Amino acid sequence: MTMPSTANGGFPSVVVTAVTATTSISPDIESTWKGLLAGESGIHVLEDEYITKWDLPVKIGGHLKEPVDSHMSRLDLRRMSYVQRMSKLLSGRLWESTGSPEVDPDRFTVVVGTGLGGAERIVESYDLMNAGGPRKVSPLAVQMIMPNGAAATVGLQLGACAGVMTPVSACSSGSEAIAHAWRQIIMGDADVAVCGGVEGPIEALPIAAFSMMRAMSTRNDDPEGASRPFDKNRDGFVFGEAGALMLIETEEHAKARGAKPLARLLGAGITSDAFHMVAPAADGVRAGRAMTRSLELAGLSAKDVDHVNAHGTATPIGDSAEANAIRVAGCEQAAVYAPKSALGHSIGAVGALESVLTVLALRDGVIPPTLNYQTPDPEIDLDIVAGEPRYGDYRYAINNSFGFGGHNVALAFGRY
């Protein structure tokens, strides 16, 4: 029995027709892309009051170039969590960029992942209750705290009735959202989907928590050089704020409305390590299986893969495990790019952001340079794109996302 795939017509052809993002380099995706190609970094010294108040060991990160709240009304600020406000902003931009199309609500789905959701509202509500009792807690607290609030905001704003979902799978949440949206479409439950990931701002508690795990870089005197994916001297990740969404739909639906596809979404693989709560399995076997599964569903072989957009957090164990995963999947010939070297780590949003960058690499036939890759690690024998952008005839690419809890997600994209 032949395994169904996109290539053999077993699944409908799914295309990406619009993308949007806000990052520490620029509030729009095209300017972010140009900045990455030019070797820009969004990582700087943090000047927030909490850095000195708590004398945090990490004093660097990447705040959004343009604050989300500068686009919000007083009512939005009062009734929405931060991730809900980000979702509202990005979904509005995405929909406008695609011409605000008329779609059948019953064939329209939304999947938006996040790592923590509206966690800041839990702290605020607790402080209010501590100071004045339960009556001080807002009746809007529940809708702001619930992790599915960001996806629900998009579903309400755009009128999606084919399901609204919220993957909460740590650093793979954004990619898993795209995977589930693709599944909704190929299973016949939807024709079009808004999908991606959002995350809250850099705050003191996440810095403290991840620092205590020794997962973060402490190169405070060299912020732009701190995130060093796959480099022998890497010492941890750096936070970088971001959010990203994309519009995917069947090729038939896109053609019917006159949309111009940016790329194809060919397959999605999801596995889990069943190894450790926060450490990846060093052998990369299950992560590599996610990559292989995405290719099987796409109808591709490992040798077809021209480019891997790596999860590449710059942690010693994480990058080694990913290198092993790429070898397990047989994709070691692919040109590898690690965007966190320039943009930092945005947790629940990062998989979506890096998926968008993968789409743009295929669209333009160019891969940005991985910053700070200076001393190759002999244990990581990969073709890391560094120094300058690399132009080429890129047909197929995989985006990797791996998260605490042993979550592994790989998305296979193709040039349109």
Curated annotation (Swiss-Prot):
Pathway: Lipid metabolism; mycolic acid biosynthesis. The gene is kasA. GO terms for molecular function: 3-oxoacyl-[acyl-carrier-protein] synthase activity. This is 3-oxoacyl-[acyl-carrier-protein] synthase 1. It catalyses: an ultra-long-chain mono-unsaturated fatty acyl-[ACP] + malonyl-[ACP] + H(+) = a 3-oxo-ultra-long-chain mono-unsaturated fatty acyl-[ACP] + holo-[ACP] + CO2. The keyword Acyltransferase applies. Part of the mycobacterial fatty acid elongation system FAS-II, which is involved in mycolic acid biosynthesis. Catalyzes the elongation of long chain acyl-ACP substrates by the addition of two carbons from malonyl-ACP to an acyl acceptor. Involved in the initial extension of the mycolate chain and forms monounsaturated fatty acids that averaged 40 carbons in length. It comes from Mycobacterium leprae (strain TN). PROSITE patterns: KS3_2.
